[in-house]
């Protein structure tokens, strides 16, 4: 629970076995070997691993832990864990508390019980977890959590962390090659830095428990638009309600204890919608901590009689929830490689990294779109509340003008009338507020980072960052190959920047992404417009993308195909669950309520006409007819939906099954939801069986 007085520096990282704890508790030699392991990627010997395991166990027991778990991130998108106690026989009918080097380093899990895309059959159940020493262990709920990767018996990747770690390693290598070309010999490592802004909804637990769709699907499948939504713009940055503020205070403290750099909280645009944003950390740590954040959002909410909804579109008619992935590159000497430089060399270096990013996004736009595609996000992307489904980059007017000057071979003149020659002069300072105004862009440069805005609120940030890291590494590799062979570095650099910006300027768009004209303009430019998950998934097995990930040993072709199959199967299963839930709600509650209300209206009309012949019953008859007509349309739609479900192919039927579900199941589920919303607006509130949007959104 929330501590009344908080000394944040003392509280922060209290439940984390971090570097400070290691330095205090490990023998000096073991501590040095651990640091060497992190710096060079060398494996730990069994003796050192045993010393770390023993120190970790002793510390965890002091924090109240009795169990440990290998904490991993399978392809479900959420974390998984199996708890084992520290106890072992002491040989005298008692027990002692132990954690061996083997128990720290390696665990076993039933790989066939997690999504594997055919990599693991039920009779090939064995899978392994392996300790990730780059991510700190922590204690939560009297259990020591050890971050791990997850793979099959034969070594095939079954999780989201392993590709992320590999992509970071490849990106590090290629960034260093570029830095050496610019004379930087001090930096030894470059790490992608990530800060995910997490959006969510908070509603009262009582109304949540009255909606089967929220409980089973995480979102409402129907609802009439409330009289007041977000039209007045009064919720965004508005005063935080006391109950929500109490929740946020406790959430902060729980996150701080676990080393999560929770920094900013505020109300979002939609009623009951909020956001929490952390300080940046390396991509691997940021991914782990975002998973912890999502878990604690739900747990802390429950302690306050609230429910946290992480679905991308829990309510129709108001904004859904996303997760902005702020991505940058930092050296171990503290330099941000995406920050415009203050010297001629840094100026050219920044433009080269910018060119690599632009080229990568243009060449692999389908893969970027694919990595944020799943059923929940299909309801959000492309609406006038979230980035469009078309990938583009927003740079702002000043930076775009600099690129135009490079493309046209002219001198750039800044607002002070100073001319700019690339590699000779410094870039003018680009005020952040001039590059952070376009909220309709899926990828925006915001002064010293790129903000990838297409992520859904419930998804792991691992896959999007794997794609960003890998495409950046590939383009930097190509650039380094060219520049390392150049006789005249400056001339080669000038030509490379000119050619790259010229070839890939089509991906830059500073306009309104919500405008219908952009769809036509994007088509003219040859940009991909992949509208939903089913359209996106073939990108996973496109030869260009398979070659990219196999070339850098991020994923094998088999692992890419497995992910393709997993996502398609998930699409079918989610669609079936939502359709079945809606059918149950309609048949058992909504149609009976509508029928009973129509009957009541007709009885009232009958009594009025028979008791006082001059008394009009037009209102009752009209309402009864409208309710009956809508009820029959809903009944027919649900009958067709039920038949479509009965005829549906198996969920693991690949792209053909997914197309069937999109055409026959999803469209009918949506149509039924619209009809229910119209019925809800007609039926007596006392007779309607479920809380309305107004009841839910304004319940806190």
Q: What do these predicted ranges mean?
A:
Residues 77-93, 112, 211, 218-220, ...:
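Short linear, low-complexity motifs centered on an aromatic residue
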Residues 48-52, 72-74, 102-103, 150, ...:
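Active-site-proximal loop/turn and secondary-structure-junction residues that shape catalytic pockets
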Residues 124-310, 319-322, 329-565:
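Glycine-rich, acidic/polar active-site loops that bind/position phosphate-bearing ligands
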Residues 47, 67-70, 266-268, 324-326:
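Histidine-centered active-site/metal-ligand motif
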Residues 1, 5-20, 169, 173, ...:
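Flexible inter-domain linker/hinge segments
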Residues 497-700:
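C-terminal amphipathic alpha-helical interaction region
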Residues 65, 69-73, 289-303, 329, ...:
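Hydrophobic/aromatic-rich, well-ordered segments within soluble, folded domains that form packed cores
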């Amino acid at each position: 629970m929330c501590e009344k007085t908080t000394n944040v520096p003392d509280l922060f990282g209290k439940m984390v076995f971090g570097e400070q704890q290691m330095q205090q508790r490990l023998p000096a030699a073991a501590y040095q070997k651990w640091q060497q392991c992190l710096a060079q990627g060398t494996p730990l010997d069994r003796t050192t691993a045993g010393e770390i395991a023993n120190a970790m166990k002793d510390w965890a027991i002091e924090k109240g832990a009795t169990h440990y778990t290998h904490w991993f991130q399978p392809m479900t998108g959420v974390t998984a864990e199996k708890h084992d106690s520290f106890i072992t026989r002491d040989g005298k009918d008692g027990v002692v508390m132990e954690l061996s080097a083997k128990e720290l380093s390696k665990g076993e899990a039933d790989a066939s019980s997690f999504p594997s895309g055919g990599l693991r059959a039920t009779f090939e159940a064995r899978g392994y977890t392996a300790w990730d020493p780059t991510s700190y262990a922590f204690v939560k709920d009297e259990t020591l959590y050890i971050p791990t990767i997850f793979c099959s018996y034969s070594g095939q990747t079954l999780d989201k962390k392993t590709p992320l770690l590999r992509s970071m390693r490849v990106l590090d290598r290629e960034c260093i090659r570029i830095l050496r070309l610019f004379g930087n010999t001090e930096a030894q490592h470059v790490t992608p830095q990530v800060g995910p802004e997490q959006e969510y909804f908070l509603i009262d637990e009582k109304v949540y428990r009255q909606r089967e769709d929220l409980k089973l699907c995480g979102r409402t499948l129907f609802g009439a638009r409330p009289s007041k939504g977000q039209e007045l713009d009064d919720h965004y940055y508005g005063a935080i309600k006391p109950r929500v503020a109490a929740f946020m205070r406790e959430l902060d403290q729980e996150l701080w204890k676990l080393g999560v750099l929770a920094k900013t909280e505020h109300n979002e645009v939609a009623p009951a919608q909020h956001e929490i944003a952390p300080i940046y950390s390396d991509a691997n740590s940021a991914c782990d901590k975002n998973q912890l954040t999502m878990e604690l959002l739900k747990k802390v909410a429950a302690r306050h009689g609230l429910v946290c909804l992480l679905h991308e579109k829990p309510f129709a008619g108001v904004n859904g929830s996303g997760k902005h992935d702020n991505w940058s590159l930092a050296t171990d000497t503290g330099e941000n490689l995406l920050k415009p430089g203050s010297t001629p060399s840094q100026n050219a270096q920044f433009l080269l990294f910018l060119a690599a990013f632009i080229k990568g996004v243009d060449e692999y736009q389908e893969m970027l779109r694919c990595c944020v595609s799943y059923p929940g996000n299909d309801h959000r992307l492309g609406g006038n509340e979230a980035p469009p489904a078309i990938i583009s980059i927003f740079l702002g007017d000043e930076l775009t003008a600099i690129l135009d000057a490079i493309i046209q071979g002219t001198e750039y003149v800044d607002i002070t009338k100073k001319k700019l020659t690339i590699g000779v002069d410094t870039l003018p300072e680009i005020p952040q507020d001039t590059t952070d105004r376009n909220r309709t862009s899926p990828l925006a440069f915001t002064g010293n980072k790129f903000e990838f805005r297409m992520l859904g609120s419930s998804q792991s940030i691992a896959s999007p960052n794997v794609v960003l890291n890998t495409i950046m590494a590939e383009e930097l590799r190509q650039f380094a190959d060219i520049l390392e062979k150049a006789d005249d570095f400056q001339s080669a650099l000038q030509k490379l920047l000119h050619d790259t910006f010229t070839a890939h300027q089509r991906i830059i768009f500073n306009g309104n992404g919500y405008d219908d004209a952009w769809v036509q303009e994007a088509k003219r430019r040859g940009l991909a417009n992949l509208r939903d998950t089913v359209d996106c998934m073939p990108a996973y097995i496109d030869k260009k993308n398979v070659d990219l990930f196999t070339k850098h040993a991020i994923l094998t072709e088999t692992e890419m195909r497995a992910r393709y199959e997993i996502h398609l199967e998930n699409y079918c299963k989610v669609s079936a669950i939502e359709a079945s839930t809606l059918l149950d709600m309609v048949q058992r509650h909504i149609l009976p309520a509508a029928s009973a209300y129509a009957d009541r209206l007709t009885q009232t009309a009958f009594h009025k006409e028979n008791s006082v012949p001059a008394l009009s019953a037009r209102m009752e008859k009209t309402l009864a007819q409208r309710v009956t007509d809508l009820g029959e349309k809903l009944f027919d739609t649900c009958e067709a939906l039920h038949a479509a479900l009965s005829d549906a192919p198996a969920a693991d039927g690949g792209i053909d099954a997914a197309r069937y579900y999109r055409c026959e199941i999803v469209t009918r589920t949506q149509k039924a939801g619209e009809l229910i919303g119209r019925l809800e607006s007609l039926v007596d509130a006392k007779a309607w069986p479920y809380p309305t949007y107004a009841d839910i959104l304004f319940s806190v």
